Structures are given as structure tokens and as C-alpha cells.
């Protein structure tokens, strides 16, 4: 079953915000500077990786996704999501994510870029699952801009797929939050701005982005 995110229907309260015009100009300039290398990566059979048997004593502090469009740096929250980050560290250290596509982008209702499936179909996983942790409350914008969380197909079905939120998003409180993007969110916004292949608001990004390698710093 494809690991898909279901948008939550919520009553939204309109709030008047005053944002300097310069802020929008800076954001557009940042996205305009993104350059992506052409890549020849293709769909892969998920690498066989054994699940970890013990939690890490010292988890990663930052995780850097080196992509064909630049680096995306994630500050992790090991204290809140030790199981998730132990598993992800195991997969990342094994090279599970190397040369894989970010296969899904959404720009209607929810605003995410989804990665972590070597098959590129949305159904790939490492062959094992693990429980949820660090779930947010069921409130508006409970997955704010910059959030990094696990994708799943139901309770306690986490695998390898994760998503990056590029604009404040409201979802059911069902997806483990394990980090926050501190650098490179402009790359995600650039991919999202390119739209969906074939049109629509949910699907394969028209602008290709692949994870070349991942660097973990503890």
C-alpha cells in the first residue's frame, strides 16, 4: 500500500498578518538562485538492511541531505524521537537513501516533499516497521514550515519514507516528527514551485530532486 498522507479538513481562522515586501523579495531571490544538476538516478529495489536491535546511546544532532540541487540540513530531536532516529541512522549509514528520488510533492491543501522510497513509487520500505513517537496535537498548522516527519500507511507503520514541510500544514496528528530544516528549505520550495508532472496538486515533482548521499553528525 502506498504510504500516502491524508489532508485533514479543519476550520481555519483567518488571521491578518503584516509581512514586509522585502521578505517576499528575499524568498523569491533565494529560490531563483537554486540550480539542480541533471541526474541519471533510476528506481531501485530497496536495499536489505537489518533493523537495529538497540537504541543509539547518542543520536545524530544534524543530518545533511546532499542532493543534486544542494544541501538540505536537518536539526534532529533525538530525545523526542529516539526510535525513529536510530532506525534512520541505520538506514542512512548503510547507504539506503543514496541515489534515490524524492518522489512526491503536494501544493494543494498540504505542502510537503516526500522522499525515502528507493522504488520511487511511494510503496517502498526497508521490510520492517516501528512505532510512532513525538506526535503533535490535533491543532491548526501542527506541521509548521520546516518540519521533517515520517510518512506512513497507518499507526505504527513507519519505514524509510519521510516528508519535509515547506509551508505551514495541518494534518491528522499521525506522523512522527523527528527534525526541522535549518538550511536548504529554499531547495524544497524550488521543487514545489515547479509543480507536479502532468499537472494537478499531488504527484511526482516536475523538477527532479535526488538524494546523492547523507551525512550524519552526532
Where are these regions (language model features)?
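Cyclophilin-like peptidyl-prolyl cis-trans isomerases
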Residues: 2-8, 12-218
